[in-house]
Amino acid sequence: MDQDWSRWLDEVPEEGESSGRAARSKAPVVRLRKRRGDSGEDAPAQRPILVVGGCGGAGTTTTALGIAGEIGAAGSQTVAVDATFAGSDLALRGADEHLSPISLQSWLYGRGDDEAAPLKECLSLATSGIGLLWRDPAPLRRRATYLTVSRAIDEAGYTPVYDGGSPIAGRHLRPLLEDADIALVLAIPARADAANRLRVTLEWLDDQFGGQGDGQGGGIVGDTTIVISHQLPGNDSRIADHLREHLDGWVREINEIPYDPHLARGELVRHSNLAAETRRAYRRLLAGVAS
């Protein structure tokens, strides 16, 4: 990949500086996942989504919950999946209706002989209508990977939204990153230092998963959506505008999630209690990565 795109990292937006939203060319959708409908014909389905952090404190869990909540609100069977290395607080933050004692591992091996138990019976639940799968610290066994998890969820008829946490380079995430059906959302907090670390992350993605012929807006980098999460009051968009100016055409899209007092509490998230502006931001994000 031509490295000219990374020169912006030597610059820092000045106080009061704000570039307008440039017209952006979108990277093509890589593939459409098919799901058999009531008519018996295959129809395009919502793409699975993997949310990972460009650094710690990026808001991957709340972003995954917000996206999943909006997919669920549209009527799709959706499950938010803990795809971190040793377990996160995904279910503790999102299961405002029912917290199941069944972990991802218990579901995955529930019937023995490498056959998963019925997914619906094992899910934690949110009042938004989505299910949640939390994982315990134990490693996946019997050579299972998150590709195994992905296939089992797809067979159950659910759309997964994975909370991958950080760092993105974790080996357990590779099967999901290698699957071009899965849309990648890269989240960072609205801080200059977090924006500057994107260079390392995007270069790593290109080195590990990019193709030799990938040009501007192509490959995994071109199919990546960057999300800037505002975790302090205010609507300062200088970081987002700066990234749009310098990454225009290189990534799929750059979106912002506004500050929301309900999310800032760090407690149980009830989707219906999110501000209208926050939910609109999740819908815009979802529209950008949807099939």
Stretch-by-stretch model annotation:
Residues 1-56, 99, 109:
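Extreme N-terminal, non-catalytic leader segments
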Residues 43-93:
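Walker A/P-loop phosphate-binding motif and the immediately C-terminal alpha-helix
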Residues 51-52, 81, 133-136, 161-164, ...:
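Conserved beta-strand segments of the P-loop GTPase G domain that flank and frequently precede/overlap
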Residues 74-130:
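Phosphate-binding loop that captures ATP/GTP phosphates
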Residues 125-176:
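Phosphate-binding/switch loop-helix module in NTP-utilizing enzymes
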Residues 171-192:
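Inter-motif core of Ras-like GTPase G domains
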Residues 211-218:
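Intrinsically disordered, low-complexity terminal tails and inter-domain linkers enriched
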Residues 229-275:
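Beta-strand-loop-alpha "switch" segments that mediate conformational coupling across diverse proteins
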